[in-house]
Every structure is written in structure tokens, then in C-alpha cells.
Amino acid sequence: MNITILSVGKLKEKYIKQGIDEYKKRLSAYAKIQEIEVPDEKAPEHLSTEDMRLVKKKEGERLLAKISADSYVIALAIEGNMKTSEQLAKNIEQLGTYGKSKIAFIIGGSLGLSNDVYARADELLSFSKMTFPHQLMKLVLFEQLYRSFRIMRGEPYHK
């Protein structure tokens, strides 16, 4: 299975990068993992609704340019469906069973995702109704992917 994690912005916090690197190493036993970061759009702190839409559109175009046409796309979005770890594992396993061996997870920037990214997504996934920094969310996603593969293989994991 080929899994791509696409996100907006460069990871800055060393401790988050260390955590992601650890889970990437662990995941390499189960799947081919690719991490792609696209530049975030520089914008002032206070934006009009139209300016926010334009920032998300530009970031969305960068994300979409990195997705292969045959990828199954799962966008992380607060309004997405929440799943247990077991349900996520089953979802990933079923995608592989039905010939979807390329999965792309998308994490938006600080303003979220563009309408074009939502339109391309095959599925919206939420980890919580709370808002998290997108860099921290990337670490949580890597951990949940690792946990999913452990569950799929019937290997022990912490509950």
C-alpha cells in the first residue's frame, strides 16, 4: 500500500518532527509512506472572507497538483466523519481489498481546505470536533496510521 500525507506549511517544531519521523520509521514495515509539504500562502492575520477564500484556493491548488489521479483522497476536516481506530483500520484494509492501493491524506493550512480540495476528496475524516494546529494533527495522523496497521495485522497496540 502507498500512503501519501500532504500538508500545507513546513513543519517547524522539532519535537513534532521527531515524533513523525519515529512513526514514519515504524510504518515503513507496513506501507510505503510519502510525506509532501506544500508552501503555505503568506497572508496578514486579519483577512476578509474573500481573501481567506483566495488563500485556501492557492494552497488547495498546490495540494491538488501533488495528488495522483488514481489516489483515494481522504481530507482531514472538522466536519468529516469521526471513526474509532478500529474503524479507520478497517477502512484502510477495505480500500486495499478493493484495489485502492494509493491513499492520500490531506491536511489543510491554518485556514482549512479549499472547496476544490473538498470536491476532489473521496472521504472527509475528522479526529475531533475541536480545532488542532495542523502540524500537531499530522503527528496524530501518523500515529493513527501506525495503529491502524497494527490492528489490521492483529498485532498488539495500546488501547
From Swiss-Prot:
It catalyses: pseudouridine(1915) in 23S rRNA + S-adenosyl-L-methionine = N(3)-methylpseudouridine(1915) in 23S rRNA + S-adenosyl-L-homocysteine + H(+). It comes from the Bacteria. It is found in: Cytoplasm. The keyword S-adenosyl-L-methionine applies. One of its GO terms (cellular component) is cytoplasm. Pfam families: SPOUT_MTase. The keyword Cytoplasm applies. S-adenosyl-L-methionine binds at residues 76, 108, 127-132. Its main location: cytoplasm. Keywords: Cytoplasm, Methyltransferase, rRNA processing, S-adenosyl-L-methionine, Transferase. One of its GO terms (molecular function) is rRNA (pseudouridine-N3-)-methyltransferase activity. Its EC number is 2.1.1.177. Specifically methylates the pseudouridine at position 1915 (m3Psi1915) in 23S rRNA. Belongs to the RNA methyltransferase RlmH family. HAMAP family: 23SrRNA_methyltr_H. Homodimer. PANTHER family: METHYLTRANSFERASE, RIBOSOMAL RNA LARGE SUBUNIT METHYLTRANSFERASE H. This is Ribosomal RNA large subunit methyltransferase H. The lineage of its organism: Bacteria, Bacillati, Bacillota, Bacilli, Bacillales.
